[in-house]
């Protein structure tokens, strides 16, 4: 589940005001318990998106911090400075929206650090109180029976001058504390890292005493470079690089997700790979957002179901855990005109009925509209229609996943 916590929803719920509750528009803790119970009854596991790096600027911690005296423990819950050039080597991630990682606060009379949007101030993990609070959040949801956490933006927890402020040793120390909390429950709980880093920098998150799995975003970029160039050279290199992992740990292999297809500034993959993708996928300038391409899988592949099958056949057969973004099994499209990354976050197309069967709400109450773009209209591209067509993309995915379950060699 992407963030379900109370939030002003300025960034899709990743701007959190209370880590131990449910957004009132979604229900309450009792409703969450019912959902968890129903999922477990169907042998489904529920993983929560846990945003460790930052809060909303409306979180009570930040509101107290900005009024607290400079240098006080309450102020130091966040990262403050008099100098907005500090940590100058840390790239601005949301470069379409932010010109700096620092924002001036009139009340505090200091700058606060934010690796994400300016309304998402970074927590200060140098402060032991912050670590204790966030470990308490882990405990809270473990006690409620969740089956794991997708640890959002884990490389950014600590800062150091002269570095990119990513994947520092202190970050790994804290993640080992998280692992210890999980192990103490004696339950089978998954810790999954979102770390958009090269393979050699992402692999340390998979140490035996750290996390169980991590997304391999470098492999994703190389897959698209192979499609764009018609050559598997970069893909072979990336696969070789990803071979050695700690026992029991796994790469998670996504083709797309709810963000832009992240390519980066030449750090995740080389500038040559980035240029290959830019040239070969023929995406217009308007589809570029921050450091990547803001399209869903099907439009990236020009609506070609054969390319969809080839790429998914790869991630279903490679060592690791395939990650299927909802709708990609149908060839769902996107809404490029929507704000920020909302283009990739439209409702799932279940049926040809109103709003794709996702909701019967009137249009003004929908957070995002269903797809009606030519070639991707939800009245044509949906689960109900494709279930009835033996040769549909959906049924192809079902057959492939059945093969994966039956053949142990495909489950390494």
Task: List each language-model region with its residue ranges.
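Active-site and adjacent substrate-binding regions of carbohydrate-active enzymes
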Residues: 1-412
């Amino acid at each position: 589940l992407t963030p379900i916590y109370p939030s002003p929803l300025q960034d899709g719920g990743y701007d959190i005001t209370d880590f131990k509750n449910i957004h009132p528009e979604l229900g309450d803790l009792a409703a969450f318990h019912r959902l968890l119970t129903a999922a477990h009854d169907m042998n489904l596991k529920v993983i929560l998106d846990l945003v460790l790096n930052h809060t909303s600027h409306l979180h009570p911690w930040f509101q107290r911090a900005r009024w607290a005296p400079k240098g006080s423990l309450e102020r130091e819950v966040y990262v403050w400075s008099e100098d907005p050039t500090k940590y100058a080597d840390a790239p601005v991630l949301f470069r379409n929206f932010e010109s700096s990682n620092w924002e001036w606060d009139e009340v505090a009379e200091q700058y606060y650090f934010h690796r994400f949007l300016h309304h998402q101030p970074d927590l200060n993990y140098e402060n032991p109180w912050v670590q204790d609070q966030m470990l308490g959040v882990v405990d809270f949801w473990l006690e409620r029976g969740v089956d794991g956490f997708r640890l959002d933006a884990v490389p950014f927890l600590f800062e150091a001058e002269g570095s990119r402020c990513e994947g520092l040793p202190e970050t790994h120390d804290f993640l080992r504390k998280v692992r210890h909390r999980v192990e103490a429950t004696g339950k089978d709980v998954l810790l999954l890292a979102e770390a958009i880093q090269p393979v050699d920098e992402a692999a340390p998150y998979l140490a035996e005493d750290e996390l169980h799995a991590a997304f391999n975003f470098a492999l994703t970029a190389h897959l698209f470079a192979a499609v764009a160039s018609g050559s598997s050279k970069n893909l072979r290199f990336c696969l070789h690089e990803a071979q050695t992992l700690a026992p029991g740990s796994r790469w998670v292999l996504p083709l797309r997700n709810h963000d832009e297809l992240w390519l980066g500034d030449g750090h995740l993959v080389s500038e040559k790979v980035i240029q290959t993708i830019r040239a070969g996928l023929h995406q217009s300038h308007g589809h570029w957002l921050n450091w990547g391409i803001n399209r869903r899988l099907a439009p990236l592949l020009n609506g070609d179901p054969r390319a969809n099958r080839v790429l998914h056949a790869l991630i279903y057969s490679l060592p690791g855990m395939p990650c299927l973004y909802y709708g990609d099994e149908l060839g769902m499209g996107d809404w490029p005109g929507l704000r920020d990354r909302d283009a990739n976050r439209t409702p799932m197309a279940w049926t040809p009925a109103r709003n794709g069967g996702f909701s019967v709400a009137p249009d003004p109450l929908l957070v995002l509209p269903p797809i009606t773009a030519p070639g991707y209209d939800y009245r044509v591209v949906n689960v109900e229609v494709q279930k009835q067509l033996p040769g549909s993309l959906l049924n192809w995915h079902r057959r492939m996943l059945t093969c994966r379950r039956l053949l142990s060699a495909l489950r390494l």
